[in-house]
Each structure stands twice: as structure tokens, then as C-alpha cells.
């Protein structure tokens, strides 16, 4: 996803409020744990993109931020929402550097849920863990991981170890944990 961002000068509450009122989202780009730049993201463009994403996919989406004539590859590390309107009010981006490891959550998609044996027998499929925490290089980031649940019967489970994890990803979450279960209704 490409975003054109502009620089902003200050962290004063009154100016941040003004940015939000004029259709912007205050944001910060971090690099190596330190603040690299204070920026403004177009609220309309970002909200439209956010609404088109599948649930959980934001954590593994790589953004190309066009900033002062250069392009910065980054992940959203934190997002803040307004309490009542649920509008995005602040973003934190983490710059991706080729040779540096990054920690992130990659969403888990259950595939073949319609053909699941346990569901056909009247069970209920429940996804216990929706994302796997991993460490990897930016080039190894994948949008999601798949877990096939077709052969899952009643009262059976699938663990994180049943997921085919690409070579460059190193899981942080223990793989012995249950990811999906089919229970009797």
C-alpha cells in the first residue's frame, strides 16, 4: 500500500487536534526504536484502505511511505482509535530495514472450513489463536499463514505446529498451543 505523507512540526495537543479536524491523522515513523519523523497521513485514504482489509491483516501489511522525496517501507506498529467514533486518531509506523529483524503478528486463515468434517457433523469451529507472533527479515514477511481444517472432526484440535511456516519466519509463540478446535454444540 502506497501512502503519500507530509511532515508535521509539533506534538502540541491543539495542533494535533487541528490536523485531525482538517482530515489528517498524526503519525510517527520509528527506526531502530527511535523517532525518525513526525508525519501526517490522509485520514480518508487510510480509512478507505483499512475498511478494505480483512480482519487482522493490518499487522502484516507493508506500507510504502512517500516522504520528502524518498520512499520508506514500514509496518503499522500501533494504531489508536477515538473512544466513541472509532476513527483512527494516531499511527505509529516502524521502518523496515533489509538486514534487521522485525517482530510482527501474521494472521492465520482457516482454509476449507466449509468442508470441515466436524462442522458437517454439527460441531462448531472456533479459532482460538488468530495470529502467530514471529521474527523475520522484511523480505520474508507474508500476508497470512494457512491452516487446513478440512479433516478436523468433533472434539479435535489443530495446533500452531500444524501450520506450514515458511523458512524465513521464526515463531515466538510456542507451537504447542491450540490454534483451532471443533466443539459440540
Curated annotation (Swiss-Prot):
It holds the Pfam family Ribosomal_L25p. Keywords: Ribonucleoprotein, Ribosomal protein, RNA-binding, rRNA-binding. The keyword Transport does not apply. GO terms for cellular component: cytosolic large ribosomal subunit. CDD domains: Ribosomal_L25_TL5_CTC. SUPFAM superfamilies: Ribosomal protein L25-like. InterPro entries: Rbsml_bL25/Gln-tRNA_synth_N, Ribosomal_bL25/Gln-tRNA_synth, Ribosomal_bL25_b-dom, Ribosomal_bL25_C, Ribosomal_bL25_long, Ribosomal_L25_dom, Ribosomal_uL5_bac-type. GO terms for biological process: translation. The keyword Transmembrane does not apply. One of its GO terms (molecular function) is 5S rRNA binding. Gene3D superfamilies: Ribosomal protein L25, beta domain, Ribosomal Protein L25, Chain P. This is one of the proteins that binds to the 5S RNA in the ribosome where it forms part of the central protuberance. Part of the 50S ribosomal subunit; part of the 5S rRNA/L5/L18/L25 subcomplex. Contacts the 5S rRNA. Binds to the 5S rRNA independently of L5 and L18. Belongs to the bacterial ribosomal protein bL25 family. CTC subfamily. NCBIfam families: bL25_bact_ctc, PRK05618.1-4. HAMAP family: Ribosomal_bL25_CTC (MF_01334). This is Large ribosomal subunit protein bL25. It comes from Chlamydia abortus (strain DSM 27085 / S26/3). The gene is rplY.
Amino acid at each position: 500500500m502506497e501512502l503519500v505523507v507530509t511532515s508535521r512540526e509539533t506534538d502540541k495537543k491543539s495542533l494535533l487536534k487541528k490536523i485531525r479536524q482538517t482530515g489528517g491523522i498524526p503519525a510517527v515513523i520509528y527506526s531502530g526504536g527511535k523517532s525518525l519523523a513526525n508525519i501526517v497521513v490522509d485520514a480518508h485514504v487510510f480509512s478507505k484502505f483499512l475498511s478494505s482489509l480483512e480482519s487482522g491483516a493490518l499487522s502484516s501489511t507493508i506500507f510504502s511511505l512517500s516522504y520528502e522525496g524518498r520512499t520508506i517501507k514500514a509496518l503499522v506498529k500501533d494504531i489508536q482509535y477515538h473512544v466513541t467514533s472509532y476513527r483512527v486518531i494516531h499511527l505509529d509506523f516502524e521502518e523496515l530495514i533489509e538486514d534487521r529483524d522485525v517482530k510482527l503478528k501474521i494472521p492465520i486463515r482457516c482454509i476449507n472450513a466449509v468442508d470441515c468434517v466436524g462442522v458437517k457433523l454439527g460441531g462448531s469451529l472456533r479459532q482460538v489463536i488468530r495470529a502467530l507472533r514471529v521474527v523475520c527479515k522484511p523480505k520474508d514477511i507474508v500476508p497470512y499463514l494457512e491452516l487446513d481444517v478440512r479433516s478436523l472432526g468433533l472434539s479435535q484440535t489443530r495446533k500452531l505446529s500444524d501450520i506450514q511456516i515458511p523458512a524465513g519466519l521464526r515463531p515466538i509463540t510456542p507451537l504447542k498451543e491450540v490454534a483451532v478446535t471443533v466443539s459440540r454444540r
